[in-house]
């Protein structure tokens, strides 16, 4: 495959160039190429069919992932935000027969794997059931979902390489030589952009542990630790979710040394949620080359991305070369040429055209604009339609607001559940008033409730997006009480 051809090429042409690095270890392209075939053979000889991978970010995660791809073994990354119950469900429902990571009940110890970067425990068991997989499946990535159990999206290596090839082409003018992974590698976006794309282009993927970056659990992040990590690990590129972009701007404003170092950035991609154009403008004024993109697991991750050779503020960029985007009559975004192989355990054939569930439009220059989720469109009691994602993106400009979720469907007024930034209670009301001045009357925040959403990780997806139905049910009594004065 293209990925391993490129690694072998750079092992010959630039053997001593760094390919992978962590705080403890570094592997050149030559060393990486020497490590992968024996490790792939070891996994293959063990008779492994489906391997569940539950490790922190680091070189072991990368080496196992790459070796499995080389050996034709299906990799099943276990998302770090899954509860113990969800982890057990994933292991059972996926038919995994091998596990690298912490012990789970019912798994037997096998001979540990000896890697140049250390020893890894290997656990085995015979699956009680083996759900069928689409032919060619190389990875099962689990969507974070908004309701119910997450779905296993089956992807082939060829599909993932098509996405990575397009990304490498779009980012090429930035001449990225080193990338720093800030998101978990279990996230398909970082797996592709933070590991595969650098290796395709001869760059170095720097992979610190999540703890070294300041992450704790699924949604807690210590800003001071992140700032120290960014100072320690100079980089040319980052991939961020909107909340991380907001934090990065705040850190740059408060830390001149960090702002000076980040001036060396050549490409910063942001996705995973709607981003206010004003937030990107602020980043660019600070010298950060931020480009918004869009994608979904069912399409192998990234579908569209702005880049150095073409950028339209407020859009998510032009579609990548490997796929085609069209807009349905009702405004839903449709994607062709990038469909997944199918869902794990589903017999339904995968349509050639993926209905994304997102609403948007293509402008005259071919840039894609996202307006919101089709199922999230809210209609007020006065018949006005609006997408809550739009209001929530505008709220990103309010320093006092850490997270916000808007509810107003069928109601005469909109209620916002707001998680304030620490120590900003006195500023919150003023900033909400300023936000309302920028919004039409039907989209304004009429009532708001302070809530600690990060204390309820089950209410958020892996990248911090709200699980709206769960949030509504969890806080329905408080929301109803807010509206009582309007409806009585």
Locate the predicted segments by residue.
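Conserved pre-ATP/AMP-binding loop-to-beta segment of ANL
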Residues: 125-142, 149, 172-179
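Conserved AMP-binding/adenylate-forming core of the ANL superfamily
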Residues: 16-45, 52, 56-58, 66, ...
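Conserved AMP-binding A3 loop
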Residues: 28-29, 138-164
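Gly/Ser/Thr-rich phosphate-binding loop
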Residues: 201-203, 235-239, 249-311
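Conserved AMP-binding/adenylation subdomain of ANL enzymes
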Residues: 161-178, 185-237, 242, 246, ...
């Amino acid at each position: 495959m293209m990925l391993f051809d490129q690694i072998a090429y750079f092992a010959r042409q630039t053997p001593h160039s760094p390919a992978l690095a962590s705080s403890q270890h570094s592997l050149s392209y030559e060393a990486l190429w020497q490590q992968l075939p024996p490790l792939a053979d070891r996994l293959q000889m063990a008779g492994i069919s489906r391997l569940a991978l539950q490790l922190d970010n680091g070189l072991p995660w990368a080496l196992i992932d790459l070796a499995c791809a080389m050996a034709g073994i299906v990799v099943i990354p276990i998302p770090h935000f899954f509860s113990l119950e969800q982890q057990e469900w994933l292991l059972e429902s996926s038919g995994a027969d091998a596990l690298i990571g912490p012990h789970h009940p019912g798994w037997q110890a096998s001979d540990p794997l000896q890697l140049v970067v250390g020893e890894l425990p290997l656990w085995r068991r015979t699956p009680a059931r083996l759900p069928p997989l689409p032919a060619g499946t190389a990875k099962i990535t689990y969507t974070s979902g908004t309701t119910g159990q997450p779905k296993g999206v089956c992807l082939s290596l060829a599909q993932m390489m098509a996405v990575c090839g397009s990304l490498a082409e779009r980012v090429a003018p930035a001449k990225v030589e080193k990338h720093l992974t800030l998101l978990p590698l279990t996230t398909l976006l970082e797996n592709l952009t933070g590991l595969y794309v650098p290796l395709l282009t001869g760059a170095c993927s720097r992979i610190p542990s999540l703890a070294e970056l300041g992450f704790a659990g699924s949604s807690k992040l210590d800003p001071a630790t992140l700032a120290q990590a960014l100072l320690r690990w100079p980089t040319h590129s980052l991939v961020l979710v909107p909340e991380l972009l907001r934090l990065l701007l705040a850190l740059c404003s408060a830390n001149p040394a960090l702002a000076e170092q980040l001036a060396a950035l050549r490409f910063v991609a942001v996705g995973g949620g709607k981003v206010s154009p004003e937030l990107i403008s602020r980043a660019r004024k600070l010298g950060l080359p931020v480009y918004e993109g869009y994608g979904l697991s069912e399409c192998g991750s990234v579908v569209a991305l702005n880049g150095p050779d073409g950028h339209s503020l407020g859009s998510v960029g032009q579609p990548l070369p490997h796929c085609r985007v069209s807009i349905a009559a009702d405004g839903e975004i449709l994607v062709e040429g990038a469909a997944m192989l199918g869902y794990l355990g589903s017999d339904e054939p995968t349509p050639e055209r993926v209905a994304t569930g997102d609403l948007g439009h293509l402008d005259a220059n071919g840039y894609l604009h996202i307006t919101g989720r089709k199922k999230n469109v809210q209609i007020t009691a006065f018949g006005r339609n609006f997408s809550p994602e739009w209001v929530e993106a505008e709220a990103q400009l309010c320093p006092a607001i850490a997270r916000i979720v808007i509810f107003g469907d069928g109601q005469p007024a909109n209620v916002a559940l707001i998680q304030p930034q620490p120590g900003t209670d006195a500023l919150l009301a003023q900033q909400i008033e300023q936000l309302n001045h920028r919004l039409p009357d039907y989209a304004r925040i009429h009532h708001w409730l302070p809530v600690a959403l990060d204390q309820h990780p089950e209410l958020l997806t892996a990248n911090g997006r709200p699980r709206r139905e769960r949030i509504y049910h969890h806080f329905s009594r408080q929301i109803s009480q807010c509206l009582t004065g309007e409806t009585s």
